[in-house]
């Protein structure tokens, strides 16, 4: 089979999509043609759902491949008959090998049904595809010893299933611990390429639109385009304006009761002033219509800042929006650029590409 590399993780929320995006960028700079393959997905060909990672990767510059061509089988198919699913996965992968010099394979997400066998199944897939594995381990709120233990355990599981690990990337690590984590991974056996990438809040930040949708709200003033800007935090404006202004940070979403119309002019002026941080948007709760006088003032003062309204109460709204995660999508230009930069700065790409080129699986 042609050259390939398998990006896998032993758990969810590792930020694997950002690593895959950075690796894809490195590969497309190095070789003439790169394909994308997702062996397991919740959104197979013909589904109404979309696998966001596949949609992201096949829409990157230099990728000439349709969404359906990048899909293997669904989780449901794998649950019903794992052996048949593996056969189909290998068969569909084989249809790509003659078209591309290298194929980037992205493992499962652990967001469907995370079980103790999921990494094992990913390992079997990697082994049968002949793909060396780039292992992405979760570094958030973990110390160097915990990350090393997670890497050792996952590498052992991969080895038992005949998959070879050529790189370990600890992702979303604490900035202050990055050097210690790199040192903890440096002596992994087998000449494994290692790296530690610090957490970047932008990469998991939801858009203001996603927050509004989570609260069943709708835009009442401002720009639809600005609804797609990332919200880097949320504050509840349950205090007077001077105290709210003290708590503003760049690109924050402000939740305020819709009958607190005294706050709106001050927040809009702060957003426009240049002396306070720009906001992601304002989400008004309680369902009260904006008074006509405030609406006229708003239309005169600001042009872009989105202001949305929900019928939900402030507590329920806040409870919903703080749970919203923001995946990297094909339209997330800031996130894509950031993922490329973080990967390029933190990973020895030349060493990683050499490891991918010379490595393979024990199973053919």
Residue ranges and their predicted role:
Residues 1-6, 19-22, 307-322, 344, ...:
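Short, basic phosphate-binding NTP loop
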Residues 2-99, 112-115:
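N-terminal phosphate/diphosphate-binding loop that engages ATP/GTP or pyrophosphate donors
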Residues 4-11, 26, 59-61, 85-107, ...:
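P-loop NTP-binding module
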Residues 4-12, 73-82, 107-116, 131-145, ...:
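Acidic/glycine-enriched edge-of-secondary-structure segments
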Residues 40-41, 172-174, 198-203, 286:
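Glycine-rich beta-alpha junction loops
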Residues 66, 72, 77, 186-204, ...:
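Ligand-binding beta-strand-loop-alpha-helix segment within the catalytic cores
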Residues 108-191, 253, 258-324, 328:
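Conserved catalytic-core segment of NTP-binding enzymes
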Residues 200-259, 327-363:
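Non-catalytic interface/targeting segments
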């Amino acid at each position: 089979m042609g050259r390939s590399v398998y990006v896998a993780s032993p758990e969810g929320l590792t930020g694997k999509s950002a690593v895959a995006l950075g690796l894809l960028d490195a590969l497309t700079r190095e070789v003439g043609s790169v394909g994308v393959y997702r062996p397991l997905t919740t959104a197979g060909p013909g589904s109404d759902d979309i696998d966001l990672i596949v949609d992201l990767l096949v829409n990157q510059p230099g990728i000439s491949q349709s969404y359906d061509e990048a899909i293997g089988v669904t989780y449901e198919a794998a649950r019903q008959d794992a052996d048949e699913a593996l056969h189909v996965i290998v068969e569909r992968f084989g249809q790509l090998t003659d078209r591309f010099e290298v194929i980037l394979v992205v493992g499962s997400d652990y967001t469907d049904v995370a079980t103790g066998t999921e990494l094992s199944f990913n390992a079997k897939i990697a082994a049968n595809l002949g793909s060396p594995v780039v292992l992405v381990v979760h570094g958030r709120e973990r110390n160097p010893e915990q990350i090393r233990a997670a890497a050792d355990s996952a590498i052992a599981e991969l080895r038992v299933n005949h998959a070879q690990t050529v790189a370990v990337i600890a992702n979303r690590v604490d900035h202050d611990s990055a050097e210690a984590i790199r040192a903890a991974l440096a002596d992994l056996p087998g000449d494994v390429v290692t790296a530690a990438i610090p957490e970047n809040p932008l990469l998991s930040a939801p858009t203001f639109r996603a927050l509004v949708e989570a609260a069943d709200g709708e835009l009442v003033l401002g720009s639809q385009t600005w609804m797609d800007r990332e919200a880097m935090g949320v504050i509840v404006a349950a205090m007077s304006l001077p105290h709210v202004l003290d708590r503003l940070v760049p690109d924050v979403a402000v939740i305020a009761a819709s009958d607190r119309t005294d706050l709106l002019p001050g927040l809009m002026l702060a957003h426009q002033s240049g002396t306070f941080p720009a906001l992601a948007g304002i989400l008004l709760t309680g369902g009260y219509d904006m008074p006509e006088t405030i609406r006229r003032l708003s239309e005169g003062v600001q042009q872009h800042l989105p202001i949305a309204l929900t019928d939900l109460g402030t507590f329920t709204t806040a409870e919903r929006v703080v749970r919203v995660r923001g995946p990297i999508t094909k339209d997330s230009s800031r996130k894509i650029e950031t993922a490329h930069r973080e990967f390029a700065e933190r990973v020895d790409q030349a060493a990683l590409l050499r490891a991918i080129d010379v490595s393979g699986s024990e199973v053919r």
